[in-house]
């Protein structure tokens, strides 16, 4: 069995078998067992639990965001244009580990959101995009930690400034929309969360491209290619989601209005 490249392990998920069992159980429950169990049951009312979960996610992601910004722009532990993991004896190595551990654990906390969808029978929200995104972030992030170690190109660039910032906005929206139907209808910025996610993927892809264009940048190039490719793939499927949910309905409304005018 391979051993993690960094001797400092992630709490709970240091054993790859626990990680694989957790992710396999997630897929089995949200795609098969959960819907089967809920088939003849009424949806659970989890409003209070979900509000607490949303507040927790806002605070958790906010903490990682603050730590990440401090790490990048106050401590200046990385050269932004060429992000390489800190050596084991670097004075900021423990800070790098802490941020990455918090981020990795949060990717497993994110899986709970899909379980809420199953228990509330929100089948439409259990889409390929949703399940794949959550699974891939936890699974690929874990493989990155296990074989590469903490930090480097796949972490603080998207972790500190982009991914966690988007999640703070997203969970703030979820919390506010859960308070009442009236407040939910007044929240006009839902689609801009998806736009922010698309901008995030674009920035990550651009950063990976700039990194790879520097022959003297000592990053792990296959991992950088992988990070950029995954960002491009996410950009495509999130763009499809945006089109089908925000552009296409408007096109249908415009066509219907034109038909009525011509009658």
UniProtKB/Swiss-Prot annotation:
Q: What does the record give as EC number?
A: 2.3.1.199
**Where is it predominantly found?**
endoplasmic reticulum
* Miscellaneous information on this protein: In D.melanogaster, functions in the elongation of long-chain C27 and C29 hydrocarbons. However, no expression is detected in D.simulans adult females or males which synthesize only short-chain C23 and C25 hydrocarbons.
Report where it is expressed, by tissue.
No expression in adults.
Signal peptide span per the entry? Answer: none
Q: Name one GO biological process term.
A: fatty acid elongation, saturated fatty acid
Q: Which GO terms fall under molecular function for this chain's record?
A: fatty acid elongase activity
Q: Cellular component terms, GO, for this chain's entry?
A: endoplasmic reticulum membrane
What is the name of this protein? Very long chain fatty acid elongase F
- Record function comment: Condensing enzyme that elongates saturated and monounsaturated very long chain fatty acids, to yield products up to 30 carbons in length.
Q: Which UniProt keywords apply?
A: Endoplasmic reticulum, Fatty acid biosynthesis, Fatty acid metabolism, Lipid biosynthesis, Lipid metabolism, Membrane, Transferase, Transmembrane, Transmembrane helix
Q: Which positions, given as ranges, span the membrane? A: 10-30, 55-75, 98-118, 135-155, 159-179, 193-213, 223-243
Q: Which organism is it from?
A: Drosophila simulans
Broad class of enzyme this protein falls into: transferase
Give the UniProt subcellular location, in the record's own words: Endoplasmic reticulum membrane
**Protein topology in the membrane:** Multi-pass membrane protein
What InterPro entries does the record tag this protein with? ELO_CS, ELO_fam
| Similarity annotation | Belongs to the ELO family.
Reactions mediated catalytically: a very-long-chain acyl-CoA + malonyl-CoA + H(+) = a very-long-chain 3-oxoacyl-CoA + CO2 + CoA
